[in-house]
Amino acid sequence: GELGEALENLSGKIFVELDYADLAGWRAWVDYPVHLPKGRGALRVWGDLDKGAGKVTADVALEELRIRLGRKLPELELASMRGRLEGDYKADHWAVAGQQVELLTQDGLRIAPTDFKVDWHQDAKTATVNGNSSASFLDLAALGRLASYLPLDTHSRELLLRHRPQGRISELRASWVLDGENLTRYSLKAGFQELGIEADHYFPGASGVSGN
């Protein structure tokens, strides 16, 4: 039978440790959840699989990555990526987390080591997505520069590009409901330092604001 079908029915524990791996070369055998035409480096992967569901953890030290996080998004080119990644998935629920994840893009943008978690559940009948996310630290200027590469809803991406936020966010907690491409409900809690937002039409903008 097809390898993909076999993997969907695979159950058991996995452990893989490689000093060097060509991730793009594995595409013939592994169905990555994102488009990954290039990438190499060291990794250690372990976890449990249960017939199309599972929990997997990976320690990675990768270089020269090209990755696309959505079908309509451009490829993000990374010089390096390091940290621990965790994935927990079922038919209607996904969770992705990272510990001390740091990135360096090919054009020199550096993302400092960050802990984060994103999980979402899709209703089988309505296809509505309920999501939650958290992050220990976010550099808003860096996030704005990466906005066009991230799987954000159209409104959020436009706001980032239009207002060009600056500053640092700490202890972020967010939740949302997504119906198709429409963000129908959200909540947000975070601390912020030296927050700045560019003015636009009736929005006055701000700079140097700190608080919660």
Predicted regions span which residues?
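Short amphipathic alpha-helices and their capping/turn segments at secondary-structure boundaries
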Residues: 120-123
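Extended, hydrophobic alpha-helical segments in both membrane/secreted and soluble proteins
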Residues: 208-212
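Extended amphipathic, helix-rich lipid-handling scaffolds
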Residues: 1-105, 126-202
